[in-house]
Amino acid sequence: MNMPNERLKWLMLFAAVALIACGSQTLAANPPDADQKGPVFLKEPTNRIDFSNSTGAEIECKASGNPMPEIIWIRSDGTAVGDVPGLRQISSDGKLVFPPFRAEDYRQEVHAQVYACLARNQFGSIISRDVHVRAVVAQYYEADVNKEHVIRGNSAVIKCLIPSFVADFVEVVSWHTDEEENYFPGAEYDGKYLVLPSGELHIREVGPEDGYKSYQCRTKHRLTGETRLSATKGRLVITEPVSSSPPKINALTYKPNIVESMASTAILCPAQGYPAPSFRWYKFIEGTTRKQAVVLNDRVKQVSGTLIIKDAVVEDSGKYLCVVNNSVGGESVETVLTVTAPLSAKIDPPTQTVDFGRPAVFTCQYTGNPIKTVSWMKDGKAIGHSEPVLRIESVKKEDKGMYQCFVRNDQESAEASAELKLGGRFDPPVIRQAFQEETMEPGPSVFLKCVAGGNPTPEISWELDGKKIANNDRYQVGQYVTVNGDVVSYLNITSVHANDGGLYKCIAKSKVGVAEHSAKLNVYGLPYIRQMEKKAIVAGETLIVTCPVAGYPIDSIVWERDNRALPINRKQKVFPNGTLIIENVERNSDQATYTCVAKNQEGYSARGSLEVQVMVPPQVLPFSFGESAADVGDIASANCVVPKGDLPLEIRWSLNSAPIVNGENGFTLVRLNKRTSLLNIDSLNAFHRGVYKCIATNPAGTSEYVAELQVNVPPRWILEPTDKAFAQGSDAKVECKADGFPKPQVTWKKAVGDTPGEYKDLKKSDNIRVEEGTLHVDNIQKTNEGYYLCEAINGIGSGLSAVIMISVQAPPEFTEKLRNQTARRGEPAVLQCEAKGEKPIGILWNMNNMRLDPKNDNRYTIREEILSTGVMSSLSIKRTERSDSALFTCVATNAFGSDDASINMIVQEVPEMPYALKVLDKSGRSVQLSWAQPYDGNSPLDRYIIEFKRSRASWSEIDRVIVPGHTTEAQVQKLSPATTYNIRIVAENAIGTSQSSEAVTIITAEEAPSGKPQNIKVEPVNQTTMRVTWKPPPRTEWNGEILGYYVGYKLSNTNSSYVFETINFITEEGKEHNLELQNLRVYTQYSVVIQAFNKIGAGPLSEEEKQFTAEGTPSQPPSDTACTTLTSQTIRVGWVSPPLESANGVIKTYKVVYAPSDEWYDETKRHYKKTASSDTVLHGLKKYTNYTMQVLATTAGGDGVRSVPIHCQTEPDVPEAPTDVKALVMGNAAILVSWRPPAQPNGIITQYTVYSKAEGAETETKTQKVPHYQMSFEATELEKNKPYEFWVTASTTIGEGQQSKSIVAMPSDQVPAKIASFDDTFTATFKEDAKMPCLAVGAPQPEITWKIKGVEFSANDRMRVLPDGSLLIKSVNRQDAGDYSCHAENSIAKDSITHKLIVLAPPQSPHVTLSATTTDALTVKLKPHEGDTAPLHGYTLHYKPEFGEWETSEVSVDSQKHNIEGLLCGSRYQVYATGFNNIGAGEASDILNTRTKGQKPKLPEKPRFIEVSSNSVSLHFKAWKDGGCPMSHFVVESKKRDQIEWNQISNNVKPDNNYVVLDLEPATWYNLRITAHNSAGFTVAEYDFATLTVTGGTIAPSRDLPELSAEDTIRIILSNLNLVVPVVAALLVIIIAIIVICILRSKGNHHKDDVVYNQTMGPGATLDKRRPDLRDELGYIAPPNRKLPPVPGSNYNTCDRIKRGRGGLRSNHSTWDPRRNPNLYEELKAPPVPMHGNHYGHAHGNAECHYRHPGMEDEICPYATFHLLGFREEMDPTKAMNFQTFPHQNGHAGPVPGHAGTMLPPGHPGHVHSRSGSQSMPRANRYQRKNSQGGQSSIYTPAPEYDDPANCAEEDQYRRYTRVNSQGGSLYSGPGPEYDDPANCAPEEDQYGSQYGGPYGQPYDHYGSRGSMGRRSIGSARNPGNGSPEPPPPPPRNHDMSNSSFNDSKESNEISEAECDRDHGPRGNYGAVKRSPQPKDQRTTEEMRKLIERNETGPKQLQLQQANGAGFTAYDTMAV
């Protein structure tokens, strides 16, 4: 083994360990570049990081340096931190990241750890402050409040107990009582209840009432923000005192307080006693046992026994004593308060560069409280220094690096860093060249060379096996320095021996470092061990020694002790290279002689011994000078004992690091023995205070211990203050400094008054402050002069105090430099000047800068008065004159200067009156005035007083307005509008008031009313109407003349706007106004407001009045009705309430209607049960009976809709007894027993049991089971002439029923004829077979005969007698009903029975007659057909209006009469009835045609209706007569006579009010058009009138041309033939030319023109199937001979010029003939009305006589929204797709027969005409698209949500106009959803149908019977159908309603825009449209489109339509 090499390896290992321990101290010593620096923290993590496991946390650490430092996170023990997957990560930017984690993943070593951030670069390392990381796992916790026991009258403290695991994160935020009292922290401290800063609830002076409350605390988690109430409620247990008791303190519960600075804290003193004790708090003076009372102020308060400190400061820290006393005893408790201040540290200087060997000093400057430890680190390693100042006496290379100062306490830490750089140039030694290991033979010489470099130049030394080599005869060391500065060293060994072998080392060393090199020199030879010197080592250290072996080769090296080879214990380690290591050396076990033995392979060995001496270092025992501080003059001593350590020991003492010399400064040092030193101080003084240190030293080491000696030193002056004098205005400073221990507190006080004695604290202000005992007074003034006391107190002795006088030397001063003084003219005046300052002071007076000498004017007198503060001088003036208005100046002078003051003397008088009063502006309530300012009397005008009054009042009854004197304009407010006022003004100054100005008169303007209508009452009239009544506002608030009222209403609790109606003012004094609001929703709350208006505007809205309409009946039945059979006589019925919106009221009860199903038709047999719950049990029912049940809800309005019938059957039960029993003798041994079934079988009869028993003997009863279908039993084997008793029972599955009556029979030879069957009633169904039994017995065999209705029966094809005697009737008919009797007869006897046969057949047509009519009801009388035999269950009454759909009503069979109510007034109706029974519905009666009473409105006389003024016209609508039908509304339009366009004024004027048309021009002719509406129609009236002139006069009538008669016209023409003939001829030529051109063009485009234009063709009309897309290409192209459709924005209608074709005898292109005969109405297809005789249809009929087939022009006309001549406008595809057009399905085509027109007998085919379209201004989504119930049609009905009363007529009006299309046809109702243009809304049939002639002739009849705005809808407006896609809007038009014209044609210009707007549709709340009588399946839009395509392209369908005369319906081009 190569021993030298091994030893070299181990030495290198130890060197590496040493290098690691030294950190980075072997870095290059070259001074860094200027921009290079060590690390410095930019962002240091905070001391504590608390986070929730649900949020996680990121800790950021940033540092700067050059090069950029590396960030490493370490634990508190210095080990590096790594990633823990999912729990802890270190991001690339140096952040320590804790992701959110689950509770079960919590790890304490990760989540509850102290971390630090380490930043390092090549210049050093720094470590951040400690980062205490604490993750909080969200845990459920509950806070508790316990009972607290308290004696009445004492204070109580209730604690909120928070579990410890969340206590650090949860705080109390409030307290709550069960009486809803809430208390929060930070409230005032003078209340009974106080929440302390620490969270407790403090209750002072507890009384009995406090014991009744319960208390809960609310806590908040500061990490999660969660708040919660305590789980328990605490109470106070209040004890009544029985006897006196001393105070008792429970101090164990409360811990010392630690609070952050500027936070609030409470120190508790929980004591109780009786009587209630008093509390007093003291604070101990720091370091002493003395205490002083706590001074209470705004910051420190005492509440009962609790001391509350707000905004705590560090000075508040200390020990507090609470002393509690009452009349019985006392107690006290101490509490320590620690106020912490955040720690911070700073090292001065932060960077310093120090040359080698020079000292370096770092000072750690820190703040905060408390400071527990101060420590220093270098490059992240502790250096064991705990003083604030770190001093390095001689800087070495290894001292360079980063130094840190750490300050710590229990809560936090802080650090500061500084860098020490080395100055100059330092190059550590470097071995540049060295010797290598060598093996050689003995003899030759050896030369070892070592070359080293460095700066400064190193010195090289040599060692052999760790022992320095010195020169001798064989070893020579030499060295020199090369020119490069390297040192070359040689070791010469002469004649090397074997003993010279070993480990040679050269060491290059300079003051900046060491470098070394070692290598083995192996010399062949025997083993040799060089002598080893004695080794001394300190106990506890590690011994490392290497055996110095020579010789080569060496086989082994071992160590021995006491001849035992080592190791012999765990502490010893032996290495093959000869190294011995002993750890933790101890004297007793390790001090010995160790032997090293070296051997070679030949067995030669060498031995060498090493003596190891273990030295023990000294150890000093702790000592102290006592716990409390000593006083001056006391004796102090301390013993320094060193129990351990080798002798000799040196023991030294130091004070504050300075050595203590025996006998100096009062110190006595006594060496009691070798190990003890005594320190004595005979008399303590301030010098002796400090830190004492005892230092014990021996060769093994040093030990020390420090103890502090506190000496209480009373204050002594360092600088005692003396009297001072300062110039006024200067900054004064008076020093007062004292020394002592504890450090004295220096305070200043000022004497109260002018003499010393009583002093008060100086108030802190901006100019007075005390800093470190020095009093500073900035800008000192005379007020600061006086005696001051400086006091220094530290609690030792009585303290020091000094009284000084501070004088302020001031020149004279006037406190008031300038003032005004006034005097009334002629009165005396005194002017005074007071000068303050050092006396003597002289004062002179000047007047207007001229010396005033009283001698020159005896009116002036000057007097002086000496004051304590100065001099007062007075100038008296006996009588003031105008000339005395001047500037007087007094000048004061003393030795220090002078000052002056001025008095502006003003002699005053009253002002003159204002003038030039003018009115600048006026309004209804104010007037703006201006005036000229008058002479002010040499005194500023204080104010103007504006006086005003009403013109009729006197000036003693005035109002005033005060105006500032500096203005000449003002506004007088609070005037009443439209009132005359007189106004004047006066001026006023301090002297008096002027005279009044001249008055002006004004009249205020009118304003809108300011008052609200009064006494508003809203009462429901019925379910849809409410009456509103009110009275006018107070007369004073009219502000003019009230013209009317706006009454607004809306649904309550909605954000919709009010809908207003206008009511004219009633002039009668005190009369109540009223208005009925109609068409409201049932049982809906409405809000009503009213405002009055005059010509200026509307007044304020009244307060909302809310009212419900009357309750209605529920419109929907209860849902989810179900029944459950409980027993044989009970059924449970359950249901769910109807939807709330359909209840229409408050549901009070539910009614259950029930009856057996077979009696359900009979109303009289139905039973009713009321209940308030949602289920009920029906009792007392028939057993095993099927019941039918319905449920309905009932409100105050009545019964609601019944639910769909449900059925349940009761359970079976045992049957009743058979109804009757017969026993018939059949022979001498047989009897036939027959019976009738039980009347109530109560189930299905399973069998009968016949019981028989012989009479007179105790024989057992015999039984015989008989099947259920057998009604007789033959008993045989009976004894002759022996009576037998028989009875029968019936059985069901439940059991056997009751027994029948007993009957006795006796067998006999005589068998008379008897019939076993019973009389019965048989019911047969129409056309079915019937059989009636007649079972007979007898001997001889009886003869059976039958009689029908008393007539003997003879057999025929339908009737015959069966062998068993039964009568069989086949195919029963109605005539078969009646009595059937069967007769049986033999020679002995005869018998008979009678059956009744009832034939069930559908009822025949009943008789319907009209009994009575009213305006809204018809009364019909119903009578069944005489031929009905089957019971009639009831009637179905069918009725419909002329243009409506069929409606039905069920009528009870018992009702003789029936009222059809809710009909339209003055309308035609059709009525018929059908009967029904349990077979079904019967035949229909004849149709009854009738009408309700009433007519259209009737025109009034013009004078009674119109009242004209200059700018308005009043309309008295009460002058109109309603024709018997209530008026619904009026439409008012007007225009000037010379204008064409009508202007709509209102389209919804209520009939009960007057109406005023405003804003007319005076002296102008106007046309007025009034359209009056009721349900019978409308009437139009036009009036001409001229407004009056401005003065009220009339204007001359207009000049109208005289009307010309026919004769006049002919005469004019004949007299101008020379002009007429050429004109006529020219016109004829032009017309002929146009006709020829048209014919030629039509031939070239025959198909296209026919398709587009010739739509009025007759039965052969068709559409070119080759061009189905023609409409799409062209849109709509107007035919050449027709007026074009209107351009959007134009003002004329196209409908008036379009010609209409007529079918029948007229040509296909005939124009409209106004004289043509009926029917002017194109009737609608009606549902099939059954004709008498079961004729349900009519296949063909000559309809041409009555009907025509309208073509495309007829259908298109109403819309008038098409594009011009092929011009196409792209529509919104989403809207265009929503609307399709469909052809009519002809009445004759298809399997469904056509239907007659509405007013014709059934069976006549008809074609349904389309509804005219209309347009109006855009309205949002007003109409919905509907699909009809049958056919292919599109229906528009109002959207149900639309509810605009401004455009809605009454509900009945629109029901009145309903039209139906069931089986086909096109039906349009209403405009598109967005355009609602009145320009095109007149229905064609009314425009042209009844204008002239016909049954409804008269020029205005198209407004007549049906009104121009006849609404067409599929079903009643009460029940609109289901919504479907809305149609697209038509092209836009001009929205200017004022310029629009309904129509420019003469034929139809009477219809107005108002009519169109008026008829937009019923209100949305009218409900759903009813279905047609015979509905077909609804089709989707896509299905309809496919159907259209099929119809258009199908030849068969077209041919069929041609054959049947089918025309094409107009296409809805609104979708183009």
UniProtKB/Swiss-Prot annotation:
<dbReference type="GO" id="GO:0003823">
    <property type="term" value="F:antigen binding"/>
</dbReference>
<feature type="domain" description="Ig-like C2-type 9">
    <location>
        <begin position="812"/>
        <end position="904"/>
    </location>
</feature>
<feature type="domain" description="Ig-like C2-type 4">
    <location>
        <begin position="342"/>
        <end position="421"/>
    </location>
</feature>
<dbReference type="GO" id="GO:0007413">
    <property type="term" value="P:axonal fasciculation"/>
</dbReference>
<feature type="short sequence motif" description="Polyproline tract (probable SH3-binding)">
    <location>
        <begin position="1925"/>
        <end position="1932"/>
    </location>
</feature>
<dbReference type="GO" id="GO:0070593">
    <property type="term" value="P:dendrite self-avoidance"/>
</dbReference>
<feature type="short sequence motif" description="PXXP motif 1; SH3-binding">
    <location>
        <begin position="1685"/>
        <end position="1688"/>
    </location>
</feature>
<feature type="region of interest" description="Disordered">
    <location>
        <begin position="1688"/>
        <end position="1719"/>
    </location>
</feature>
<dbReference type="GO" id="GO:0006909">
    <property type="term" value="P:phagocytosis"/>
</dbReference>
<feature type="domain" description="Fibronectin type-III 5">
    <location>
        <begin position="1402"/>
        <end position="1495"/>
    </location>
</feature>
<dbReference type="GO" id="GO:0050770">
    <property type="term" value="P:regulation of axonogenesis"/>
</dbReference>
<feature type="compositionally biased region" description="Basic and acidic residues">
    <location>
        <begin position="1974"/>
        <end position="1993"/>
    </location>
</feature>
<feature type="domain" description="Ig-like C2-type 6">
    <location>
        <begin position="527"/>
        <end position="613"/>
    </location>
</feature>
<dbReference type="GO" id="GO:0007419">
    <property type="term" value="P:ventral cord development"/>
</dbReference>
<feature type="compositionally biased region" description="Basic and acidic residues">
    <location>
        <begin position="1944"/>
        <end position="1962"/>
    </location>
</feature>
<dbReference type="GO" id="GO:0043204">
    <property type="term" value="C:perikaryon"/>
</dbReference>
<feature type="domain" description="Ig-like C2-type 2">
    <location>
        <begin position="138"/>
        <end position="230"/>
    </location>
</feature>
<feature type="domain" description="Ig-like C2-type 3">
    <location>
        <begin position="247"/>
        <end position="338"/>
    </location>
</feature>
<dbReference type="InterPro" id="IPR021012">
    <property type="entry name" value="Dscam1_C"/>
</dbReference>
<feature type="domain" description="Ig-like C2-type 1">
    <location>
        <begin position="39"/>
        <end position="134"/>
    </location>
</feature>
<feature type="region of interest" description="Disordered">
    <location>
        <begin position="1787"/>
        <end position="1846"/>
    </location>
</feature>
<feature type="disulfide bond">
    <location>
        <begin position="160"/>
        <end position="217"/>
    </location>
</feature>
<keyword id="KW-0472">Membrane</keyword>
<feature type="glycosylation site" description="N-linked (GlcNAc...) asparagine">
    <location>
        <position position="53"/>
    </location>
</feature>
<keyword id="KW-0393">Immunoglobulin domain</keyword>
<dbReference type="GO" id="GO:0048846">
    <property type="term" value="P:axon extension involved in axon guidance"/>
</dbReference>
<feature type="disulfide bond">
    <location>
        <begin position="736"/>
        <end position="790"/>
    </location>
</feature>
<feature type="glycosylation site" description="N-linked (GlcNAc...) asparagine">
    <location>
        <position position="1022"/>
    </location>
</feature>
<keyword id="KW-0964">Secreted</keyword>
<feature type="glycosylation site" description="N-linked (GlcNAc...) asparagine">
    <location>
        <position position="1186"/>
    </location>
</feature>
<dbReference type="InterPro" id="IPR003961">
    <property type="entry name" value="FN3_dom"/>
</dbReference>
<feature type="compositionally biased region" description="Polar residues">
    <location>
        <begin position="1826"/>
        <end position="1836"/>
    </location>
</feature>
<feature type="glycosylation site" description="N-linked (GlcNAc...) asparagine">
    <location>
        <position position="492"/>
    </location>
</feature>
<feature type="glycosylation site" description="N-linked (GlcNAc...) asparagine">
    <location>
        <position position="325"/>
    </location>
</feature>
<feature type="disulfide bond">
    <location>
        <begin position="833"/>
        <end position="890"/>
    </location>
</feature>
<dbReference type="GO" id="GO:0050976">
    <property type="term" value="P:detection of mechanical stimulus involved in sensory perception of touch"/>
</dbReference>
<feature type="disulfide bond">
    <location>
        <begin position="450"/>
        <end position="506"/>
    </location>
</feature>
<dbReference type="GO" id="GO:0008046">
    <property type="term" value="F:axon guidance receptor activity"/>
</dbReference>
<feature type="disulfide bond">
    <location>
        <begin position="1334"/>
        <end position="1382"/>
    </location>
</feature>
<dbReference type="InterPro" id="IPR013098">
    <property type="entry name" value="Ig_I-set"/>
</dbReference>
<dbReference type="Pfam" id="PF00041">
    <property type="entry name" value="fn3"/>
</dbReference>
<dbReference type="InterPro" id="IPR036116">
    <property type="entry name" value="FN3_sf"/>
</dbReference>
